[in-house]
Amino acid sequence: MKKVTVSGLLKKKQAGEKITSLTAYDASFAKMFDEQGVDALLIGDSLGMVLQGEDDTLPVTIDDIAYHTKSVRRGTERAFVLADMPFMSYATPEQTYANAAKLMAAGASMVKMEGGSWLCDTIKGLNLRGVPVCGHLGLTPQSVHVFGGFKVQGREASQAEKLLSEAKALEEAGIQLLVLECVPSSLGKAVSEALTIPVIGIGAGKDTDGQILVMHDMFGISANYMPKFSKNYLVETGDMRKAVSKYIEDVQSGAFPSPEHSFQ
């Protein structure tokens, strides 16, 4: 199979083809997802919750992400690999460049950062140093204490307008992908249509350019909790590989996410 690149993901958007993505944290699952045809794999700071048992993503370190990025890269031949910049790992320019370099050296093809237009100068600096950037707007888990919990964002007209404005600013600054999390479906559609870069949704409705799920949610192995925007594909198919294949099929056909997995 041909190796997935950021330009290839852009071509998918331009052709109206949905992008499929999952989180991955080790070589074995990365290999499985890669072989099934998932377009992009994210080493997410969600590992703090699903692997380390934390209540949120804040304790995750850059070394944690680098370790798992190395593992995922070893299991991946064709999928595009993104790695999260964890909480407070990009507080200053010097810190940002050093930490991004660590993730790229570990095997990432792009780093993902949570935040709005305040990141624009940082994004420009990373691009100048050869580091591609993915943005992340909507519910940004590193800001959970600012939001007062894991809540849907952008329901108020003023919030939606601000988010759309920030998405445009991030694109202008140089991001090449955007993850949009937990926003009303109408806002997910508006952002995707307003940007030329691919928008990957998680709880952002079916009209984004692609979808991403946390693998533990897709397999139904997150302890006692299933987010509204997720679907347990393992219980439906009874086999991990079939679950991944069904997820890809549903995203590409537009069957997932359905209204029950979306916010209004």
Curated annotation (Swiss-Prot):
InterPro entries: Pantoate_hydroxy_MeTrfase, Pyrv/PenolPyrv_kinase-like_dom, Pyrv_kinase-like_dom_sf. GO terms for molecular function: 3-methyl-2-oxobutanoate hydroxymethyltransferase activity; magnesium ion binding. Pathway: Cofactor biosynthesis; (R)-pantothenate biosynthesis; (R)-pantoate from 3-methyl-2-oxobutanoate: step 1/2. It is an enzyme of class 2 (transferase). It catalyses: 3-methyl-2-oxobutanoate + (6R)-5,10-methylene-5,6,7,8-tetrahydrofolate + H2O = 2-dehydropantoate + (6S)-5,6,7,8-tetrahydrofolate. 3-methyl-2-oxobutanoate binds at residues 45-46, 84, 112. It holds the Pfam family Pantoate_transf. This is 3-methyl-2-oxobutanoate hydroxymethyltransferase.
